[in-house]
């Protein structure tokens, strides 16, 4: 019976990165032996155990045989006869197929250490093609390790393209796709994930609303990068710089879906694109069962981001309608997220990364002034019923107007 540290912990240590979960592989043991040593079995589909003291995971060495389509159609075989090399062969990437024994000796039968040095994400064997989820995992790894200079090996990218063309991605469940999407959006450079998917054709297969944006031009005056798909990736990168929140980053991803619907004869203008994108966002969120908070913020950003961009041109009454529509009175935190997404949209353009964008600050100040209007004073003044609501709106409008006047004075 031999125990090895495997997977991400070994990879990250060799890269000099913080180690996450420590997964162990046990070769030459039976279920009965593990239980006798005090381990607790937790694996349903294959033998995985928790260490009695550390609670770290220990899995028996196993092989996998494809039976059926998709990423769930596998039959696992675990026995004391399965070797270390056989177990590592079933793994996705060579950099994840390195093992370290209890003496600290590395075992690298498939060249993972060299690929770490070359910064390559390369599949271990042709069996990679049996699991379509690996397309998303490789794209996510490319995003996760982008800062370290990793790229997908050409032969792996070619295999991912073959899998996509064979329709394998159709076998992924919506929940599993969203889980991968959520992981990558919470990472540092999610735009790389979508770029890799586009290279292998998977973006069109999984996220056609996003793929449709590439090649769609926008006015060069406001979008020197021209391409709406490129702009969306730049906005996503800015959103990651501005906010750690999943909903903000997701909203940044979806904010220009409507531009993909503009007929070419109207390019590069996209009048009303925010509203045109709303059905696409709803369908996207329903398809992948996205959390309500992600859906709701994405809809708000698509609908209102152009209003925020021209906030200085809006009448106070129009700005009050924006606050009402966004339910900013009851959901001020979500409105702050909307402003962050708008900041990402503004700065996500070539040459605009460091430009001053004061509109969200003005809008936030106007909202704060309107929120400060005391309802108790209105009631104390004798207003009743519908008159309370009307008087509250009037006083909020006056508060916004004062902010507008003061802001104009400060700017001058």
From Swiss-Prot:
Family of this protein: Belongs to the tRNA nucleotidyltransferase/poly(A) polymerase family. Bacterial CCA-adding enzyme type 1 subfamily.
Which positions form S-S bridges?
none
How far does the signal peptide extend, from start to end residue? Answer: none
Task: Copy out the cofactor comment.
Answer: Magnesium is required for nucleotidyltransferase activity. Nickel for phosphatase activity.
GO process annotations (BP): RNA repair; tRNA 3'-terminal CCA addition
Molecular function (GO) terms for this protein are: ATP binding; CCA tRNA nucleotidyltransferase activity; cyclic-nucleotide phosphodiesterase activity; magnesium ion binding; phosphatase activity; tRNA binding
User: Which organism was this protein described from?
Assistant: Aeromonas hydrophila subsp. hydrophila (strain ATCC 7966 / DSM 30187 / BCRC 13018 / CCUG 14551 / JCM 1027 / KCTC 2358 / NCIMB 9240 / NCTC 8049)
What is the protein name stated in its UniProt record? Multifunctional CCA protein
Q: Note on file? A: A single active site specifically recognizes both ATP and CTP and is responsible for their addition.
Q: Where does ATP bind?
A: 8, 11, 91, 137, 140
- Keywords in alphabetical order: ATP-binding, Hydrolase, Magnesium, Metal-binding, Multifunctional enzyme, Nickel, Nucleotide-binding, Nucleotidyltransferase, RNA repair, RNA-binding, Transferase, tRNA processing
